[in-house]
């Protein structure tokens, strides 16, 4: 089956030529500012195959819409067949009707003639039903295939457009908002293009055909009925305008909520450490409340609009009932109009107007799709000023690497009043290494970005080999550059793939070349010791690796490109001392023959630069070689002195010591491989236990959601009981309207059939009058019921979706960190599910519940009426119903099954989307936009193949649903006529026989009409079932998250708390494995104790377990063996919020949120604690951040941008330190807290941290040994074990591993 499906998919792919979006942007008229696109613009990406599918689908929809009222033509003929007035004209006189020799043959002949005529008409109706079934098949198949193809195509174009946008554009847009749109907006576009668009054509055509037939049969009667049309059109127009307005406003706020979700879910360690889960949930909830407010307004608008429409429709019928009697009395020479004609007019117009009630949902969905397309197409249409996809620009045959910055002036687009570079002049000749040093925020990294052409200068020019960068092809330019940034970005793939991503376009390095680059970056050794080697998955954002390991892989990725220009922005800041020395030598070697620009705070790494430029407030104030600047004794000299640099290292001695250390590590690694865990107290079955825990949890969740459909409905009623109760009443009442309305139509028809003169009898007048009054009452009831079951249920459904979205986000926010480490819970997957799954729940909530109640009520009342008037006919017709119900059920099941692989694929593509957009600058610097586009495209292959697998099945069962629904009508007439013929008393005189015949016809007609409405209701249920199937699947996914109880619950109120926390930390025989990597033991029996107020430093090579130890203290994870104690209390027994409120943490990669500087610092305040602005200023001063914050145009109210993109790395780090200090913690965890700071800031901040550490228990992870010399104890960790411990001097005297590290950093050691 899969082979055949793939073949069909590939065959269709031949025709899958997507129009170029740039060409379309030039040809198409841009969407206006109405917030919505036109229908033509909506289908702008349809190629000729899609247009054929659209045309055929519309043809099928029109066929369905036309054939349904056409069946009523046949029904009119059936009515006229029973016209007793015409039948009685066969008798010459009144006496003959009572003569047995006349009336007995006549009675037999009449029933035979009627039966034969009915049978012929039944055959015609069956043909119409078959035609409708074929039309339904074409509509379902074509719209399903076309909408899925368009959805996939728009997803790909939107993703490609996001990768294309320049850095300036991203400064104004949060990545979370952008990525959430692909899950919500694109899905809504796809829904609007699906079968629901076909239903609009079907109901519209049915409306037109119904009125057309009405005009053809009796134009003035139809015109009278249409007299209310202006009011109907006005109601529908106002409905559409306001519904679209509220949709646009709601979607904007939903995008803002998505941005919050992505920013927090992507940085859960920071959120948990700050204890800000509740605060972010409140922020998210506030955005969702705005969405709910607009959605409720939309729901009430739709309910009022449709209620008004139904009221005017019923008013039109009341007026028409009166005028029909006038027509049949022969007024105006219209005697040729029959009762059958009147019935045709009424039923056709009834079908036409009933379509208006059905069209509301698809119209609302279509309006939403157009509003969503407006936002998506705006992004797709945008051609950035710096276009990485542009083929324009010169591509020189060779690049020498001469870089010139001439009078460069620059301001960031988001801060146009803040001058970053003011007239910068800098010349770098081929092969030179130029170092940029200076305080954080002085313009060093900005210069790097200008050389990459992430931005263009606002004044002056940047040139390469004498050519302005703006005149060069952007892709060619970036292919000449290798970049290693301050915060290393890795992608969620293998180490091999991450390194290979650095290769130039069109080049595929060999395995040997890749390994050589890894060796140059000092990465090969640690990679080789990983269980999977180069095939090890690095996790989301490289979470499976330490900071230093990530940095080394990033360096290897840059080296494999063999760039002409090498840009190193703090390239070794995250490395341990041993790695830094080796990697620095590798970088210096790699720089030979290349133009290299180095941004560094560690001045030891730039001493050998050809030239060193000292930046200050966007200008170069000193430049020269190291020795020249030292002789100058200016700013650079002061920076060097602050770092306490001494004489050069004895290289030979260091290399010998490093060789010994490597031999020791390799020997230890061999012992570990031979005796895994035999020397620890860790449970030998721990690996199997970790796997069993995961499998057990998944099984438990699956079992708990078995009755998810009932749960959603009950949840809706429980929380929105007022709206749901009145909506339920409205649905029940609305279900009674059309069945009782059909009784009045039959009464009207029978009354009209009895008119045989120009004068109405008193009974006929009373009947007409009563019918008119009752229809008006039905109109009022329709207004109330439609408002209640559509408006109130729609509002309740929107509120439920908002509540589920909030509950889902709330649950995500309190999951333990190990849950986020799983592949299926990566940021892209979770944000995709958060955006799409609650929206899909509309299929089993809101107006869908109202529709189901309305349909069930209609079926119930209709069947009750049918059985009351003719149980035999009803029972015979109902024999078809079980088959119809089975078909409807299978149809829903198929839709649910079809949604599973598609949803999984969209989640997979969402992972690629989020990581590429979040790291778009890295993607663009690597010129790997097409690579990620292909990965994204490949992830969408499954739903693309699934289109051709599921479309035929779904279409067949939809065809059967339509066919069976419409066959019930002629089948009922056939059975009814048969029973009339069989039960007729032929011995009665003609008048009595005709009365009995007429009575039986009336009863049969009422029963059949009621059953027809019941069947149509089941058919309408068939249109809803596909959404129900998809919604059930989404509900299971949603409640999987909501129901999950984390092992470490940050919301839990359980656990001990105690006063007078001292801050004493103790590790007792700690063993640890990450749950997602149970085969890899990270910590192997570590024990140490940190007394109150003491400082313990953890040092060692990257990946040895230092940061893991800090995460255990924060209780991000629990150890697999041993205990972590706080003041003698096992932290597992402590309240988790209480524990974390005692800890202040500054991580290696600072995480800021898209809010003001003051709000970011305030994030450090524990829950329930109030701080003044003065306290915030004091914390900022301690972190040496107050001065640069105050210098910003808006001071502490300055927005830092998405993930702090608007400020430098050093500025981010200082704000993060201020955020930790304002907590006034008992325990201070500093994981490379000063790694991103310049020398001047580092000295001041280190003094501040030393001061802050007094009286506090402090655990420091640092590669710069100068920052930990005064620690009370230093623990040297090697491969998960403490190899050495002692004070700085004790470890130097030991002359072991620490001694070697010290020699590397300080040269000679006293």
Swiss-Prot record:
InterPro entries: AAA+_ATPase (IPR003593), ABC1_TM_dom (IPR011527), ABC1_TM_sf (IPR036640), ABC_transporter-like_ATP-bd (IPR003439), ABC_transporter-like_CS (IPR017871), P-loop_NTPase (IPR027417), Type_1_exporter (IPR039421)
Reactions mediated catalytically: ATP + H2O + xenobioticSide 1 = ADP + phosphate + xenobioticSide 2
Residues of the ABC transporter domain: 403-642, 1065-1304
GO MF, one annotated term: ATP binding
Keyword Translocase annotated: yes
Stretches that traverse the bilayer: 48-68, 125-145, 196-216, 223-243, 299-319, 342-362, 721-741, 773-793, 849-869, 871-891, 945-965
Location in the cell: Membrane
GO cellular component: membrane
E.C. numbers: 7.6.2.2
SUPFAM superfamilies in the record: ABC transporter transmembrane region, P-loop containing nucleoside triphosphate hydrolases
BP GO terms, sorted: transmembrane transport
Membrane topology: Multi-pass membrane protein
Top enzyme category: translocase
Glycosylated residue positions: 336, 402, 608, 816
Function per UniProt: Energy-dependent efflux pump responsible for decreased drug accumulation in multidrug resistance parasites.
UniProt protein name: Multidrug resistance protein 4
Species for this entry: Entamoeba histolytica (strain ATCC 30459 / HM-1:IMSS / ABRM)
Taxonomic lineage: Eukaryota, Amoebozoa, Evosea, Archamoebae, Mastigamoebida
